[in-house]
Amino acid sequence: MLDQTLEPLRAVIARHGLSADKRLGQNFLLDSQLLDRIARVPGDLTQKTVYEVGPGPGGLTRALLKAGAKVTAVERDRRCLPALAELSAHFPDQLQVISGDAMEIDEAAVLGEHVHIVANLPYNVGTALLIRWLTAKTWQPWWSSLTLMFQKEVAERITAKVGTPHYGRLSVLAQWRSEAKLSFPVHRSAFVPPPKVMSAVVHLTPKDQPEGLSLGTLEKITAAAFNQRRKMLRQSLKNIEHMMEALELAGIDATRRPETVSVAEFIAIGRHWEKLSA
């Protein structure tokens, strides 16, 4: 249960003179009901380790603490650290705040295993962080689930089904290594200040064992294919040696366009290409 003596979040923001910094991709989320809803997406967090990136003044952090989680939050905006320190003082056994850049932290070493990542990600680094987590060198990864706020367009790319307009490289990567679903949209009016675009919460859980294929191979093929997404595969992949043979062995018609190729089919193409290139 959240400490009833906590100062209201808006009052904390006003007292510390905080405002969202566009340079850091910040948009503060203050709606407590919405924050509680986000915290419920991963399931029961009681005594679970949760990693939060970019907590800002601590709105989502409060919801996670209320849910019983043990939270490690990393924040690069030093203006927010005093407000987070006050929150940590209320929850000394539940909240650890790290001042730093999430892209530079050795998360597995700091956090251990079986970590739930829950974050309203800064828009300017959200996709880079997702790719970092999806391409963990060891699998199973150190994280157990990802519950992340993105711009709605990015969320749709992550969860897009084959044959739909948003299906692309990010869809293939995310769905190769995880089960990804769009949990719910979030209206721009929920943020302070309101961003220009709508947002959405995405939930990802790692697959037990992604089908055997090197990350480099998948990235090479999908980059070439989707960089020319309106072209047939025989055009977009023609400069990769042995690729036409790999398509034939995988039973893929070279006149198809990349948005019609499923994740499983990209994996099959990659496997045959690796054998031919060995």
Swiss-Prot record:
<keyword id="KW-0694">RNA-binding</keyword>
<keyword id="KW-0808">Transferase</keyword>
<dbReference type="InterPro" id="IPR011530">
    <property type="entry name" value="rRNA_adenine_dimethylase"/>
</dbReference>
<dbReference type="InterPro" id="IPR029063">
    <property type="entry name" value="SAM-dependent_MTases_sf"/>
</dbReference>
<keyword id="KW-0489">Methyltransferase</keyword>
<keyword id="KW-0949">S-adenosyl-L-methionine</keyword>
<dbReference type="InterPro" id="IPR001737">
    <property type="entry name" value="KsgA/Erm"/>
</dbReference>
<feature type="binding site">
    <location>
        <position position="29"/>
    </location>
    <ligand>
        <name>S-adenosyl-L-methionine</name>
    </ligand>
</feature>
<comment type="similarity">
    <text>Belongs to the class I-like SAM-binding methyltransferase superfamily. rRNA adenine N(6)-methyltransferase family. RsmA subfamily.</text>
</comment>
<dbReference type="InterPro" id="IPR023165">
    <property type="entry name" value="rRNA_Ade_diMease-like_C"/>
</dbReference>
<keyword id="KW-0963">Cytoplasm</keyword>
<feature type="binding site">
    <location>
        <position position="27"/>
    </location>
    <ligand>
        <name>S-adenosyl-L-methionine</name>
    </ligand>
</feature>
<feature type="binding site">
    <location>
        <position position="75"/>
    </location>
    <ligand>
        <name>S-adenosyl-L-methionine</name>
    </ligand>
</feature>
<dbReference type="GO" id="GO:0003723">
    <property type="term" value="F:RNA binding"/>
</dbReference>
<comment type="function">
    <text>Specifically dimethylates two adjacent adenosines (A1518 and A1519) in the loop of a conserved hairpin near the 3'-end of 16S rRNA in the 30S particle. May play a critical role in biogenesis of 30S subunits.</text>
</comment>
<feature type="binding site">
    <location>
        <position position="54"/>
    </location>
    <ligand>
        <name>S-adenosyl-L-methionine</name>
    </ligand>
</feature>
<feature type="binding site">
    <location>
        <position position="101"/>
    </location>
    <ligand>
        <name>S-adenosyl-L-methionine</name>
    </ligand>
</feature>
<dbReference type="GO" id="GO:0052908">
    <property type="term" value="F:16S rRNA (adenine(1518)-N(6)/adenine(1519)-N(6))-dimethyltransferase activity"/>
</dbReference>
<keyword id="KW-0698">rRNA processing</keyword>
<dbReference type="InterPro" id="IPR020598">
    <property type="entry name" value="rRNA_Ade_methylase_Trfase_N"/>
</dbReference>
<dbReference type="InterPro" id="IPR020596">
    <property type="entry name" value="rRNA_Ade_Mease_Trfase_CS"/>
</dbReference>
<feature type="binding site">
    <location>
        <position position="120"/>
    </location>
    <ligand>
        <name>S-adenosyl-L-methionine</name>
    </ligand>
</feature>
<dbReference type="Pfam" id="PF00398">
    <property type="entry name" value="RrnaAD"/>
</dbReference>
<dbReference type="GO" id="GO:0005829">
    <property type="term" value="C:cytosol"/>
</dbReference>
<protein>
    <recommendedName>
        <fullName>Ribosomal RNA small subunit methyltransferase A</fullName>
        <ecNumber>2.1.1.182</ecNumber>
    </recommendedName>
</protein>
